[in-house]
A protein has these predicted regions:
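Juxtamembrane intracellular "pre-TM" segments in multi-pass secondary transporters
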Residues: 2-21, 227-268
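Hydrophobic core of transmembrane alpha-helices in multi-pass small-molecule transporters
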Residues: 100, 107, 113-135, 353-367
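Intracellular juxtamembrane helix-capping segments at the cytosolic ends
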Residues: 134-147, 367-381
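Multi-pass alpha-helical transporter architecture, strongest
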Residues: 106-108, 214-225, 427-451
């Protein structure tokens, strides 16, 4: 049974100013600050630039955190469907990610140049990234509590757009902390390292505690204002044994019943491939921009801001486009953008050409999550929605194990050939997008009933 929340076309403008929807979307803003500041920018640079390690070390950390998510996603889906409680788990994982992120900065300062800093930092990052991704499973499933099926595209688009506004806020707000542009008392309170005058790009380690605080502050509206709704269609679901046993039993039963949900399973397989490329681009964007294109720290910040600005516009518009033409057609449009972006990025040897790549990547990132999140809602029956959101996450997270490892192995094997390894690595991602597009051919239109 869909939630009965002010159905009708009159909600077009007022939809986004509903307090629960606005509070829910604020978490998109909060977690995207973490994703950009930590996953895409400062942690990979901390590993490769500050500690002087190869890309493959960061690749391992990302992949390990995704292995844990892949293993536990089925259990989270059961918790959503059977207990119908998303909020407590979302808050728990969000706070875990926040604490682990801040700990990287604090412990890093305490250890200084001690050799153990690499392994402690990698361990804390694995925990932070795991918890962040776990929170998204419960967060994505909350969208069904906020509006009718016909409003999913707009609600999803609003969340993604606000999320990328968070990226802009995060990038701008973090700069003075990293470059030493804050008062001494602030540096002492936040346990920041001193920044020597003329230090190019500042101190990467100083990004972690302020990012953790921003993540926390912008998460508070969701923590206090978004409540769980019980769904009558899912009430009364009983299961034998423990949550663990039931979680994996359900996954097995779901795969056995693949014939019943052919369209949805085709989509999950397609999603596995094309999101592999997207997750890898997000993870290595900063490393590629600085290592291959030679962007300075300030140029990288501007590049990311421009990409994010286009992500905001793209995601907001894609919400309306998805509601208008359907999520499947929208996904095709977005994937063609990724094809063009990856080709240009792999051959770009001038700044103007690379800036075009940044714009396309920005539009592609924002639009991808809008259309895919909407399609999974359209294709999944309400009583199994949590289960399928778990599989949706599982598909994306397993792919996030493979992509970074492919990148890391290629760049490691070709490390003696300059930037050729990175260019081949980013071009290799094109194959994953094309496979995903080919598999999408037989995914049904989400507006039709899937049986």
């Amino acid at each position: 049974m869909e939630p009965q929340i002010e159905r009708g076309t009159s909600r077009n403008a007022s939809l986004f100013f509903s307090l629960p929807i606005l509070a829910w979307a604020m978490y998109d803003l909060a977690n995207t600050i973490f994703s950009m500041n930590i996953v895409s920018r400062y942690f990979p640079l901390f590993v490769t630039e500050t500690l002087g390690q190869e890309d493959i070390m960061f690749s391992f950390a990302v992949s390990i955190s995704m292995i844990f998510i892949a293993l536990l996603s089925p259990l989270f889906g059961v918790l959503i469907d059977v207990r119908q409680k998303k909020r407590p788990y979302l808050i728990t994982f969000a706070l875990t990610s926040i604490v682990a992120t801040g700990a990287i900065g604090v412990v890093g300062q305490m250890l200084g140049t001690h050799p153990s800093i690499l392994y402690v930092g990698l361990g804390l990052f694995i925990l932070a990234n795991f918890a962040y991704n776990a929170s998204l499973i419960f967060y994505n499933a909350q969208i069904t509590d906020l509006g009718s099926r016909s409003e999913m595209g707009r609600i999803s688009g609003f969340g993604v757009a606000l999320g990328y506004v968070g990226t802009i806020i995060g990038l701008l707000a973090i700069t003075p902390f990293v470059t030493g542009g804050v008062p001494d008392w602030v540096s002492k309170v936040l346990y920041l390292a001193p920044v020597a005058p003329g230090t190019e790009g500042g101190v990467n380690l100083n990004a972690f505690v302020p990012t953790a605080l921003m993540f926390l502050v912008f998460s508070l509206p969701l923590f206090f204002m978004v409540k769980d709704r019980r769904d009558a269609a899912a009430d009364g679901q009983a299961f034998q044994g423990s949550i663990v046993k039931e979680g994996y039993s359900r996954v097995w039963r779901t795969f056995k019943s693949a014939k019943e949900y052919k369209g949805l399973f085709r989509f999950l397989i397609a999603y596995f491939f094309f999101t592999d490329a997207i997750n890898t681009v997000i993870a290595f964007m900063s490393v590629y921009a600085q290592g291959v294109m030679g962007l300075s720290a300030s140029q990288l910040t501007l590049f990311l801001l421009v990409a994010t600005a286009f992500a905001v516009v793209g995601s907001f518009i894609m919400g309306f486009v998805t509601d208008k033409i359907g999520s499947k057609k929208s996904i095709y449009v977005v994937l063609w953008l990724w094809v063009v972006a990856l080709i240009i990025a792999s051959v770009a040897n001038t700044m103007p050409l690379f800036w075009v790549t940044g714009i396309l990547i920005g539009i592609g990132m924002g639009s991808t999550w809008v259309s895919t999140r909407t399609l999974i809602v359209e294709l999944s029956p309400v009583e199994k929605r949590g289960e399928f959101f778990g599989l949706f996450s599982l598909s994306g997270k397993v792919s996030a194990i493979i992509g970074p490892m492919v990148w890391g192995v290629i760049t490691y094997l070709l490390r003696d050939y300059g930037d050729l390894g990175s260019r081949i690595a980013i071009l290799s991602l094109l194959l994953f997008v094309l496979i995903g597009m080919w598999l999408m051919r037989k995914v049904p239109d989400g507006s039709k009933e899937i049986v």
